[in-house]
Amino acid sequence: MTYIDTLGQQAKVASRQIAKLSTAAKNDLLNQVAKALVAESDYIITENAKDMANASENGISKIMQDRLLLTEDRIAGIAEGVRQVADLQDPIGQVVRGYTNLDGLKIVQKRVPMGVIAMIFESRPNVSIDAFSLAFKTNNAIILRGGRDAINSNKALVTVARKALKNAGITADAVQFVEDTSHEVAEELMVATKYVDLLIPRGGARLIQTVKEKAKVPVIETGVGNCHIYVDKYANLDMATQIVINAKTQRPSVCNAAESLVVHADIVEEFLPNLEKAILKIQSVEFRADERALKLMEKAVPASPEDFATEFLDYIMSVKVVDSLDEAINWINTYTTSHSEAIVTQDISRAEQFQDDVDAAAVYVNASTRFTDGFVFGLGAEIGISTQKMHARGPMGLEALTSTKFYINGQGQIRE
């Protein structure tokens, strides 16, 4: 029996045990986990410091180190997120529909747990607890495989959760942690059809592509965000400037940060020079521009074709000039990762056309792409942002981690 077989078998057994937990029992456990995270902050920070030291030694960028860092405030924020999940309405057992058919059968469709969820993710250690809390709230067991960069932080966080489960008399195997960060073990998890009911990868383009190519278990893709801001010819340019600055610079290392700027030719001469001046007062951003934009920006560099398809996760932004709304939409649909896209315009009909025609999970009018988030959307914590057109699209909250089951009651009916 392999390492993943052992974890998978334990998770499968645990999933059957926790499937019967009541809402009250689940909420009480989540609140206990939240308390334990705060109480164990020193331990978690000590383990996180090991990852931070390794990151510094390995030359990981400051932006990526910030994703990795855990402080008392950030741990308190993670704990608050767990409490918020406890406060969310429990979807398990909810009736999706119910009716009596022509044969007199009473048919009810209810939400039920998936069973065992596996998650492969990178860098951000808070994901481990976010994922556990959502899985547990929906009566699912979860297997977590984090990245090498955050191995000590993730292990510490999961250790705290497992201890809280044990103290509550609930099987600690409701959350499993894969300590082996090798690609071989990750790929074994991707094909563990005997145990895993759903796999959610959360990370960069390379991880997502590897999972798409090698997984044999059901997968929901998340994450990669080549997000665009299109500044229309009817845009309020002051508003557009603030939206671009926020979407690019507030937190560039996350998947809902803007990576590409598309500007209508009619306003480009006024907008781009002013945007460049405004943004550089706040943050040094490297603009990689097409030929027309390059002539209007003092510090821009020429863009390569690859730049328009890149999720930079850094203070870098590609710039494209277009001659029409249709061209903007076609351009975005060519390069989008179907995450979050935005238009800035005062023309309602053009805004509606953009929202209808752009193929993305979240399409904004006159707002930053940075709002694509489970809490902001009122879904609570998210396990990821789905860029597929499956049952789950956009921020994945509790309902995305459920399946449905038909309950049929009869009185001796047979089919003629």
Curated annotation (Swiss-Prot):
Gene that produces this protein: proA
Keyword set, alphabetical order: Amino-acid biosynthesis, Cytoplasm, NADP, Oxidoreductase, Proline biosynthesis
PANTHER family in UniProt: DELTA-1-PYRROLINE-5-CARBOXYLATE SYNTHASE, GLUTAMATE SEMIALDEHYDE DEHYDROGENASE
Pathway it works in: Amino-acid biosynthesis; L-proline biosynthesis; L-glutamate 5-semialdehyde from L-glutamate: step 2/2
Main enzyme class: oxidoreductase
Presence of keyword Amino-acid biosynthesis: yes
Protein name as catalogued: Gamma-glutamyl phosphate reductase
HAMAP family linked to this entry: ProA
Locations listed in the record: Cytoplasm
Catalytic activity: L-glutamate 5-semialdehyde + phosphate + NADP(+) = L-glutamyl 5-phosphate + NADPH + H(+)
Family to which the UniProt record says this protein belongs: Belongs to the gamma-glutamyl phosphate reductase family.
